[in-house]
Structure formats: structure tokens, C-alpha cells
């Protein structure tokens, strides 16, 4: 609100009248859903209200009240800002300022979100020359009331000063910068209907630059001008109508300006469009898929239009052309262009050839507007006959098998909808959301991200990112096999049933149709079937157990299959979300790969031989650090076999060096160091064991914003706990070396206290978890040997969750022998190895599971 006197009774009456009229319009929109009528009606209602206030303020006829921006277009969304310009003559009485201020205050009193400026014509032109945002808002200026002559003078001066070329360049740059803020993709899980790529702002930008150039201000006018076809104009109008309706519905549902399609509103928005949940898809998923298809079409058509407008504004002076494929394609100014509009109709196999040429031709940076338009209008050509054409199948395999350019080619094939036309099952997952709380991309974008990750392993310029993966793929024969597996690993998502099993059938059919036979075909199908296996073993099973390794090695069978699965697994996890991958998961996978490779090479997965090997390596490292030869014995004699199998040689050596003088310490020994794997802190705790120890340590981590990635808990023969934790700081850019000493001091002090365990903090769930909560699950069962109990917990992630679990265990005197903490984006799947004499009692098991479910409940 403006800083003026409280509204008068008359102002309050007008406000109520305005509010009632607006509410009536919104109610009609709820039932009729005619967004154009609503936006124009809201604009007229606002015009009439502002005219009355203008008249009441007695502003002279020499001034003009101008609507600018979306309001100037006559398109007001329910809770949009109302942007106005009070246009002054060059010579005006400064005494008018108070009346203008009163006018703006009274406009606010109506309940309008006013964005106002007060300028002369000269000031408008000056401001517009300095700021393209001002220039854009003035482009659609419309007189509401006041001097017609003054407004006409402004219009003439504005267009005289407007440089269409400079405006085009500025708006395209602005659009690129805006797209970059949204990661250059329309496929955000919470898109901004107005600002995201493929949103309303893209459509407005095109009409702005067309209007500035004098080409027209509507899709019909651009069609008449020849910049788009009648069909394209129809598509643009249809998608624009959908996006405007969606935005208006969001405003109405939220009761305020709301342009972001957030999780909380997706279901209500979907229901307002008449979508209803089915067994396979939520209502919100159906709406989002429609949104993504609309945004994708807008992105395609916007690219065509911008290139066409650019060609008219900046006619080429040196059209250097080279023939790339006789009678089909030429290169024109770095773009791949068809020789005429009938190429794809005469030669349907040229459709895929376009992407192969784009991929292999140096200097070609994209497809020209003419080529993009021809592709867009060739949908009927891409039919079953086209898909079955042996030449097309050969070309598709050539695209997959090139040494470079694969990722760019496939992204472009998806953007132009050619990929989904060629692989019909891929088309089914375009725009398919994944509500599993750790994928942040739609299924099609995730698949292309996995393909991109595999390709980066193979490109020398990126070898520093994941050197081990780059080394492996460099020695992997026919890496295109991995790319095919990547295309199919999630292709059956959203169909109901096991997507790995359904995807196998799709992959098998693809191999048969594309001449992939023998071991290559078998490997592709096997990878699709088992693409989750390695991550499940590495993150959820005890890989220090030789039996686990033996079973995994039997599933894999040979080195080629192991390497392929490892590379696909790393690429897959990294393609889910930037949050899900971390160096600790990378180490778990690499360790599993190396141990399994040794077993496949003939090494015996025997605990005794592995223990002996690690001890010898650890002793060699201790000698390098000048630890006396027999100094380790006092500690090692107290440790069981499990300790040596759970830690590698370097870790054993570090812990021995820290503890060999303190085997019978009376107070807690706490040591912390930056984790050798990076991006984490390793914390060692050595103290006399007690039932609440694990919970007490977790309480400290919880209170200090440290997230536990892994916990390895050992108990010595003489009753000491030797616990190791890998933790990360929730704050970014933390230097773990700087906080190591603080953690040592604070945690040692905390362990010396005898205070009862504090209440767990009830951390807030993220919006994603609140909107898509998962059912918490707790499973407690004895292990195969009956020595320990395995506790599996899955729940929405939140601060304090691990401590909540540990506290329940401590209250029942249940000791934690090992813990595998597995955070998958917004979801956790934790596994604990428990010891506790009473756990064989069924009543205790039921009580424990009940209390754990209560503790992890949202």
C-alpha cells in the first residue's frame, strides 16, 4: 500500500464493488474457462475503475493515463500487476505532483497491485533507450483516459526511436539469459508457466520483436506475412490458450499471483482441467505431460520463428553454401538446410539423415528454420512404413555409433519429436514425471542425461571428471552397446508393472529389428534387466561379506558385463539429480567393481585370505609412518574379522596409528579428518561401549547440521566401541579441514556428559516430500546366520530422521553393529545391522517396529 491516509468510506465502497465484480468474473471463468474473455473483462473492469478515480482526482485533460505491459495488451491475469504510465506534457505544473500521487494511492485502495511511472514523452524515450525492459513495456502502450494528442505524439516519437534490429538482438539475448536461469529446459518438475523455456514469455517475446519490426502483432498477421504457416499459427494459438488458461487457473487456485506450477498446486490445477487419477497415472502427471508437450511445441516453433525474423531483419550478405547431400541438404551459414520444402516428402529417409549430417559435419551448429519447419510438418511421413525402412534403421544405428556428437544429435531429435516418432515407446515417456523423490527430470530427459553421462566418459576433454570410468570405457569394445542400453533402461516407466522386465522386451525387439545379434544383443537386454542391481548391492548390502560378492559375481558372470553395468550404473545415478550422486556412493560402486573383478579373475572370495591381504597392506603403510613393528598388536588383538573386512587397508592403518597408544583409554578418543574420498568428513569414535552411544553420536550430528552418509560400527573384545562415520555438512562450500578440530572437541565433550538423550528435532519436510509423501516402512528380520538382525527403514528424508531411529533403538537397549545410510534425493532407505539378545522375542520386535514407524512418520 502507498503511504497515504486511510481509505475513505467511499473508497472502501468502491473497493468492495470492484472486488465483487472481479469475483463474479472469476466464478464465470471457473465454469466456462474462457481465458481470453476473462483477461479482457478484467482489463475493462480495471480501465473503468481507473477512469473513475482519474476523474475524481480532477487531473487536467493535458495529461494521459496509459496502460503498459500485459495490461496495455488488454490481457490481465487474475492477480497480475497493473502497470500504468502517467504521461506528462513537456511543460507541466509541479503542483500536479500531489494530485498524481493521490490518484496512485486511490488506485491502490481499489485493491490493485499498481506498478506506476510518471514521465514526459522525452523521459520515456530516454528511459527506453537505456533499458530494454522499459522499451518493451512501452511497445504495447494503450491510452485509458486523457489527452489523445499527447499519446499520439508519444507513439510517433517512440517508433521513430525504436531500432528493430537492436531490439531483436537485446530480446533474444534476454531470452537466452532467462532460459539459462531455468537450466535451458522446459522440463522442470515445477515449471514457471510464464518464464520457463516454452512458456508464455517466449510467445510474448516473438510477438514483441515481430511488432517492433513491423511484421505484425498476432499469429494471424505473422501467417499472412509468411513468417509462419497457417498450421503453425493454429498450433501457437492452441498452446498459447492452454498456457494462459493454466496461468489463470493457478492465480485463481492460489488466490494471488502464482506463475510457478509448484507441487502443492499441481493436483488442484489438474482437477480444474478435468483430469482424474488412473491406476497408472496421477491427475497431476497427466496435466504435467500436457504442459511439457505444449512447452516443447512452443520451443520448436519459437526457434523457427526467431530464425525467420532474423533472416528478414539481417539479410545474409555472404550465403556461403556447400552441398552436403545431393538433392537433399546444403550447409548455409553454419546451418543444415534442405534444398527445397519437398525433400522429406520425396525422401523420407532424409529425416534421420539430417541428424546424422548434423552430427558428423564440422561447422554445422544446428538445423535451419526451413529444415525445422519441414520436420515439424512431416509428422504424417513418420509412420510405421518409415519406422520399418531398413535404410532408416541403418541410419539410426550410424547416429548411435559416431565417435562424437551423439548427445547433441539425440537431444535435437527429441526436441523436434523425431526420436519419439522413430521409437514409439520413447514417445510414451516424453514429459512423464517421476514421483519417486529422487529423479528431478522427466523420464525422457533422464534417459538423455544418462546417455550424455556415458558419452562424457568417452570424451578426452572430460576424462578428469571420472578418470576411472573414462579408463574403462576407453578399453570397452563397441561402447554404442551401452548407449542402446541407456535408451531402453527406463523406457517402460509409467506403464504399470516392472519397468526393467517390460524394458527388456522393448530392447530385445529393437536389437532384432536393427541387426544387433549375439553377445551384443544379450548384453543390452541383460543391462536393461539388471540396471538397478549394482546400486542395490553397493548401497543396501554388506559388501564386506564374501557371500554377497560371490552372489553378485554369479549374476554378472564376466568382466565385460561387470564393466558395462558399472558404467551404466554411475551414469544412471548421476542422471537422476545433482543431489543424489556423491563421492561416497562413487567409492561404494568402485569398491564393489574392483572386488567383483578380482573374484571373476579367479580370486577366492574367502574372508580369511582377504583379511590377511588387508592386514599386510595396512602394516606396510604403518611402517612407512614409522609406527613400531609390534605396536599394532594390542589393538588388533581386540578386533574381530568384521572390522578388517569393513575397512580398506589405508583406513585400518589410519585408525591403528590413532589408537595404538590408547587401547584402554578412560575417556573418549575422537578424531576427524577430511574423508580420503573427498567432499566429506570422516569421524572416528573410540570409547567404552554403552547402549545409547550410537544415538548420542547421531544426536550431536543432528544438532550441528551434519548428515551421516555411512556408519561402520565395531565392538572390541574388551568392550570398546570403535565407530566410524562419514558425514557431510549441509552448508555448501564448507572446508572440512577447518571444522575437524571443532568436531573432535565438541563430540568428545558431548560423550563425556551423562545427560539423557535430547528430544529429536522435527525438521520440516521439503515441499516435494509434503506433496508426494511415501508410506514409511520398517522391516526387521534375522540374518541368514541368525547372528544379527537386519533393520530396513524407508521414509521421506528430513533433518533429525537418523537420530529419531537411533533413539528408539537406544531406549530398547538394542546395539547397532553397522549402518548403511542411503539418501536418494528426498527419500532415505537405511539399513542397520543390529545385535541385541532380546530381539528374538516377537513381542519386542512388534513393539520396536511400531515405535520406529511412529518416530519416522511425517
From Swiss-Prot:
Domain HD per the UniProt entry, residue ranges: 443-565
Transmembrane segments: none
Ways its activity is controlled: Uridylyltransferase (UTase) activity is inhibited by glutamine, while glutamine activates uridylyl-removing (UR) activity.
Cofactor(s) required for function per UniProt: Mg(2+)
InterPro entries: ACT-like_dom_sf (IPR045865), ACT_dom (IPR002912), HD/PDEase_dom (IPR003607), HD_domain (IPR006674), NT_sf (IPR043519), PII_UdlTrfase/GS_AdlTrfase (IPR013546), Polymerase_NTP_transf_dom (IPR002934), UTase/UR (IPR010043)
Reaction catalysed by this enzyme: [protein-PII]-L-tyrosine + UTP = [protein-PII]-uridylyl-L-tyrosine + diphosphate; [protein-PII]-uridylyl-L-tyrosine + H2O = [protein-PII]-L-tyrosine + UMP + H(+)
One Pfam family here: NTP_transf_2
UniProt-recorded Gene Ontology molecular function terms: [protein-PII] uridylyltransferase activity; phosphoric diester hydrolase activity
EC number: 2.7.7.59, 3.1.4.-
Region (Uridylyltransferase): 1-324
SUPFAM superfamilies in alphabetical order: ACT-like, HD-domain/PDEase-like, Nucleotidyltransferase, Nucleotidyltransferase substrate binding subunit/domain
GO biological process, one term: regulation of nitrogen utilization
SMART domains linked: HDc (SM00471)
Keyword Nucleotidyltransferase: yes
Keywords per UniProt: Hydrolase, Magnesium, Multifunctional enzyme, Nitrogen fixation, Nucleotidyltransferase, Repeat, Transferase
UniProt region (Uridylyl-removing), positions on chain: 325-681
Every ACT domain range: 682-761, 790-858
Top-rank taxon: Bacteria
Known function: Modifies, by uridylylation and deuridylylation, the PII regulatory proteins (GlnB and homologs), in response to the nitrogen status of the cell that GlnD senses through the glutamine level. Under low glutamine levels, catalyzes the conversion of the PII proteins and UTP to PII-UMP and PPi, while under higher glutamine levels, GlnD hydrolyzes PII-UMP to PII and UMP (deuridylylation). Thus, controls uridylylation state and activity of the PII proteins, and plays an important role in the regulation of nitrogen fixation and metabolism.
Free-text note regarding domains: Has four distinct domains: an N-terminal nucleotidyltransferase (NT) domain responsible for UTase activity, a central HD domain that encodes UR activity, and two C-terminal ACT domains that seem to have a role in glutamine sensing.
Family, as annotated: Belongs to the GlnD family.
NCBIfam families attached to this UniProt entry: PRK03059.1, UTase_glnD
Protein name: Bifunctional uridylyltransferase/uridylyl-removing enzyme
Organism: Burkholderia ambifaria (strain MC40-6)
Amino acid at each position: 500500500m502507498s503511504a497515504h491516509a486511510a481509505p475513505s468510506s467511499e473508497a472502501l465502497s468502491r473497493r468492495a464493488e470492484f472486488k465483487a465484480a472481479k469475483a463474479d468474473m472469476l466464478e464465470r471463468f471457473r465454469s466456462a474457462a474462457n481465458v481470453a474473455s476473462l483477461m479482457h473483462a478484467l482489463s475493462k473492469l480495471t480501465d473503468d475503475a481507473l477512469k473513475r478515480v482519474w476523474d475524481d482526482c480532477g487531473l487536467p485533460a493535458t495529461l494521459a493515463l496509459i496502460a503498459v505491459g500485459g495490461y496495455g495488451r488488454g490481457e490481465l491475469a487474475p492477480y497480475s500487476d497493473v502497470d500504468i504510465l502517467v504521461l506528462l506534457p513537456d511543460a507541466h505544473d509541479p503542483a500536479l505532483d500531489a494530485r498524481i500521487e493521490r490518484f496512485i494511492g486511490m488506485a491502490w485502495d481499489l485493491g490493485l497491485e499498481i506498478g506506476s511511472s510518471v514521465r514526459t514523452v522525452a523521459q520515456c524515450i530516454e528511459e527506453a533507450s537505456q533499458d530494454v525492459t522499459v522499451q518493451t513495456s512501452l511497445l504495447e502502450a494503450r491510452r485509458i483516459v486523457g489527452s489523445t494528442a499527447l499519446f499520439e505524439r508519444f507513439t510517433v516519437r517512440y517508433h521513430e526511436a525504436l531500432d528493430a534490429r537492436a531490439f531483436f538482438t537485446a530480446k533474444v539475448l534476454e531470452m537466452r539469459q532467462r532460459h539459462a536461469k531455468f537450466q535451458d529446459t522446459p522440463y522442470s518438475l515445477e515449471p514457471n508457466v510464464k518464464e520457463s523455456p516454452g512458456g508464455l514469455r517466449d510467445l510474448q517475446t516473438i510477438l514483441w520483436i515481430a511488432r517492433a519490426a513491423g511484421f505484425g502483432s498476432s499469429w494471424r498477421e505473422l501467417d499472412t506475412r509468411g513468417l509462419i504457416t497457417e498450421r503453425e499459427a493454429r498450433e501457437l494459438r492452441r498452446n498459447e490458450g492452454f498456457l494462459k488458461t493454466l496461468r489463470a487457473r493457478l492465480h485463481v487456485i492460489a488466490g494471488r499471483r502464482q506463475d510457478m506450477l509448484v507441487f502443492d498446486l499441481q493436483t488442484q490445477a489438474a482437477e480444474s482441467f478435468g483430469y482424474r487419477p488412473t491406476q497408472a497415472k496421477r491427475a497431476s502427471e497427466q496435466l504435467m505431460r500436457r504442459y511439457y508437450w505444449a512447452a516443447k511445441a512452443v520451443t520448436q516453433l519459437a526457434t523457427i520463428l526467431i530464425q525467420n525474423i532474423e533472416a528478414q531483419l539481417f539479410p545474409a550478405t555472404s550465403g556461403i553454401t556447400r552441398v552436403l547431400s545431393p538433392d537433399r541438404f546444403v550447409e548455409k551459414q553454419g546451418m543444415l538446410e534442405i534444398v527445397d520444402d519437398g525433400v522429406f516428402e520425396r525422401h523420407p529417409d532424409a529425416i534421420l539423415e539430417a541428424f546424422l549430417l548434423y552430427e558428423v559435419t564440422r561447422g554445422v551448429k544446428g538445423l535451419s528454420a526451413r529444415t525445422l519447419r519441414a520436420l515439424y510438418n512431416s509428422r504424417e511421413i513418420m509412420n510405421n512404413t518409415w519406422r520399418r525402412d531398413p535404410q532408416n534403421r541403418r541410419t539410426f544405428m550410424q547416429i548411435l555409433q559416431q565417435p562424437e556428437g551423439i548427445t547433441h544429435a539425440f537431444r535435437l531429435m527429441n526436441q523436434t519429436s523425431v526420436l519419439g516418432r522413430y521409437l514409439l515407446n520413447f514417445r510414451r515417456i516424453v514429459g512423464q514425471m517421476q514421483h519417486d523423490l529422487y529423479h528431478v527430470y522427466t523420464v525422457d530427459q533422464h534417459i538423455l542425461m544418462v546417455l550424455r553421462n556415458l558419452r562424457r566418459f568417452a570424451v578426452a576433454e572430460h576424462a578428469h571428471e571420472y578418470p576411472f570410468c573414462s579408463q574403462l570405457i576407453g578399453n570397452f569394445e563397441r561402447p554404442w552397446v551401452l548407449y542402446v542400453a541407456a535408451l531402453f533402461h527406463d523406457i517402460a516407466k509409467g506403464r504399470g508393472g516392472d519397468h526393467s522386465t517390460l524394458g527388456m522386451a522393448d530392447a530385445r525387439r529393437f536389437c532384432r529389428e536393427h541387426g544387433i545379434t549375439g553377445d551384443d544383443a544379450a548384453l543390452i537386454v541383460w543391462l536393461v534387466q539388471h540396471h538397478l542391481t549394482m546400486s542395490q548391492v553397493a548401497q543396501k548390502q554388506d559388501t564386506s561379506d564374501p557371500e554377497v560378492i560371490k552372489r553378485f559375481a554369479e549374476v554378472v558372470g564376466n568382466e565385460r558385463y561387470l564393466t558395462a553395468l558399472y558404467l551404466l550404473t554411475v551414469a544412471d545415478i548421476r542422471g537422476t539429480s545433482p543431489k543424489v550422486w556423491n563421492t561416497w556412493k562413487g567409492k561404494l560402486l568402485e569398491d564393489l567393481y574392483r572386488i567383483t573383478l578380482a573374484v571373476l579373475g579367479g580370486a577366492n572370495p574367502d574372508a580369511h585370505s582377504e583379511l590377511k591381504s588387508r592386514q599386510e597392506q595396512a602394516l606396510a603403510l604403518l611402517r612407512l609412518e614409522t609406527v613400531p613393528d609390534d605396536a599394532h598388536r594390542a589393538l588388533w588383538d581386540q578386533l574381530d574379522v568384521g572390522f578388517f573386512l569393513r575397512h580398506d587397508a589405508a583406513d585400518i592403518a589410519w585408525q591403528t596409528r590413532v589408537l595404538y597408544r590408547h587401547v584402554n583409554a578412560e575417556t573418549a578418543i575422537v578424531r576427524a579428518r577430511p574423508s580420503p574420498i573427498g567432499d566429506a568428513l570422516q569421524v572416528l569414535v573410540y570409547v567404552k561401549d554403552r547402549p545409547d552411544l550410537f544415538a548420542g553420536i547421531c544426536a550431536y550430528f543432528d544438532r550441528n547440521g551434519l548428515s551421516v552418509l555411512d556408519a561402520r560400527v565395531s565392538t572390541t573384545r574388551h568392550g570398546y566401541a570403535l565407530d566410524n562415520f562419514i558425514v557431510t555438512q549441509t552448508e555448501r562450500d564448507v572446508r572440512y579441514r577447518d571444522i575437524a578440530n571443532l568436531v573432535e572437541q565438541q563430540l568428545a565433550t558431548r560423550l563425556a556428559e551423562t545427560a539423557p538423550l535430547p528430544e529429536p528435532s522435527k525438521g520440516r519436510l521439503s515441499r516435494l516430500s509434503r506433496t508426494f509423501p511415501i508410506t514409511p516402512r520398517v522391516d526387521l528380520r534375522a540374518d541368514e546366520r541368525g547372528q544379527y538382525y537386519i533393520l530396513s527403514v524407508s521414509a521421506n528424508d528430513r533433518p533429525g530422521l537418523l537420530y529419531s531411529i537411533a533413539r528408539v533403538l537406544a531406549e530398547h537397549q538394542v546395539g547397532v553393529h553397522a549402518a548403511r545410510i542411503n539418501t536418494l534425493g528426498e527419500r532415505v532407505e537405511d539399513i542397520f545391522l543390529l545385535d541385541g539378545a532380546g530381539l528374538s522375542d516377537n513381542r519386542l520386535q512388534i513393539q520396536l517396529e511400531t515405535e520406529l514407524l511412529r518416530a519416522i512418520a511425517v
